[in-house]
Curated annotation (Swiss-Prot):
Keywords: ATP-binding, Ligase, Nucleotide-binding, Protein biosynthesis. One of its GO terms (biological process) is translation. It holds the Pfam family GatC. It comes from Synechococcus sp. (strain RCC307). This is Aspartyl/glutamyl-tRNA(Asn/Gln) amidotransferase subunit C.
Length: 97
């Protein structure tokens, strides 16, 4: 069994950029120990000779056929904009220089 200290939990929280209150340390310490014990079990499994896999079940993408669909006339779209400038939508500036 792994031994995790309160300082270890604080360090992991800091590395993960989590604001972990001190009263939560006691809750997360045994949980982190169990996670590390499980990882140790996984590391002990002999995978020599097994082909690498990325998922347990092979997945096939199901996509629709591409097709041409009618689109609104550009002028109709531009006329619906709150503001426009010529053939462009005018939007508020969000970045300075």
């Amino acid at each position: 069994m792994s031994h995790i200290s309160a300082d270890d939990v604080r360090k992991v929280a800091q590395l993960a950029r989590l604001d972990l209150p001190d009263d939560s340390i006691a809750t997360f310490t045994p949980q982190l120990e169990r996670i590390l014990d499980f990882v140790a079990q996984l590391e002990a499994i002999d995978t020599e000779g097994l082909p690498p896999t990325t998922r347990a079940v092979e997945v096939v993408n199901v996509t629709r056929e591409d097709g041409v669909e009618p689109t609104p006339v550009r002028e109709e779209l531009l006329n619906q904009a709150p503001q426009r400038e010529g053939d462009f939508f005018r939007v508020p500036r969000i970045l300075n220089n």
